């Protein structure tokens, strides 16, 4: 065989081999100088190098890139309907500036992000489906055609009508801030309420813009993995790839403690390695119209430092945290109309469990049930990530009927765990949601079967109403008091109760002390209600003392907003705060907390001044009774030979 025949054969064989399909960015050089062409080509090479291999191989076409004079001044670039990328010609001068290295660097960074952004749009519009996804989409489309929306399996919600690669993926929409509306068979919310600490507010305009903006940060920002860990994991899984220069993350998630207890740290970190379990925490219903179906929360069972994860972590109650969606009410009066029409923000409060237990069992006299959720380690980790993300970004709208605590909690469980069993659960009440979770095997209520055991192990926190009745039964067994029910005893005036305070033995006196403390708490609640009614009656009437008090009250309510919206404490950055923002967070949270405590002290003084003399006397008499009982208990203890601490 001659060299000519051999060469021809090789050439024919090469023609038969499949070409390597991949994206090619081709500069349109018309009208550009040599310097401009060189700078533009370098930009395209850098953009191409930053893209995931999967994206490059799927976008297997020539994408023309052209500098355009037709774009508005504020538009840096745009992907055209024909598949080309247009860059604003006005930005070219800064890219080629030889006398300003800073301007050139800033321009290159902006143009690089723009190129990635527009290529992300092209990729999203391409509706690229992986080999693993294809059977699911085919099956879901077939089932929707035969069964319709009503009979569609949970795993098919949002899959059958897919038109894009990423921006209509149900998983991405959950993480991004377009969750499913309750009772709408998969229809998504129109508005994205994860608006705080956004890297670019343009991402909130639509899911397609969200994808483009976040692909910019996924590819170009080394901190993205730490600031938006759930979304980083989503893109990494989609592309089976991650950028090489990803920053190492701390592994724990920062949060702001919504408690104003001075003994508590204002800032904390949730370490997933210390979270043993997640419980559905239910406050029982009461007669108040806003609480008649209970209140749903999530309890994080956090182990004490050094304790291995296990059942004993249930004993570390002082470490446990509560995730509670609540309406942020910037007024003393809770309005049913405002609650029905969505005039209250819905926010995720993070509170110590001990405070939540006191709030419900002692003040509201409502019991709490803590039911373990059946989550695996991956679901638990995802839930913690999403809760932290919502804590720093979410400012929703609270509706008492269709976007209340139960709905918000269910949406968090869906987006955090990605458990498809949750997708077709529908409930707008806390008790109803618990029943559904139990019915699907996601909640284990067997821990409540033995009430005494449940109380000892921390699965049930009884209302103090029952405890008060037990204490009162002790009193009635030793003293001939005039009341039969504890409510009647607490309703007596402090001076009437004082007649019986010096008659009991040590056990009876201890019971009387607990009841007197309960009576004082009840009195303070009555004072709060009386002051609210007086305040509302005299508001806007020109009452001099009230005007000053009203101004302070409004300021206090407005200033307390940061407790549920911690993003207010930071002026820059996005997503979860990082180490370089921690010092600013500590300083500002400390200053704001002290300011609130000072205002609250001043407000208490002014409000007490508005009380009538009879109510003030009742409060003082209650304090006196508590002091007398405490002293008598010490005397009886000494007389009985009890241990004395010196």
Stretch-by-stretch model annotation:
Residues 22-95, 154-158:
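Auxiliary, metal-adjacent structural segments of Zn-dependent hydrolase domains
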Residues 1-8:
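Bacterial N-terminal signal peptides that target proteins for export
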Residues 95-103, 125, 130-203, 213, ...:
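Activation targets extended, charge/polar-rich intrinsically disordered C-terminal tails
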Residues 78-86, 91-114, 274-365, 605:
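Glycine-rich catalytic cores of cysteine/serine-nucleophile enzymes that process amide/ester linkages
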Residues 29-38, 95-110, 197-202, 283-287, ...:
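Second-shell loop/turn segments in exported
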Residues 182-191, 268-275, 290-291, 376-387:
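Active-site-adjacent bridging/hinge elements
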Residues 109-129, 212:
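Active-site recognition of the HExxH zinc-binding catalytic motif
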Residues 16-18:
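N-terminal signal peptide c-region/cleavage motif recognized by signal peptidases
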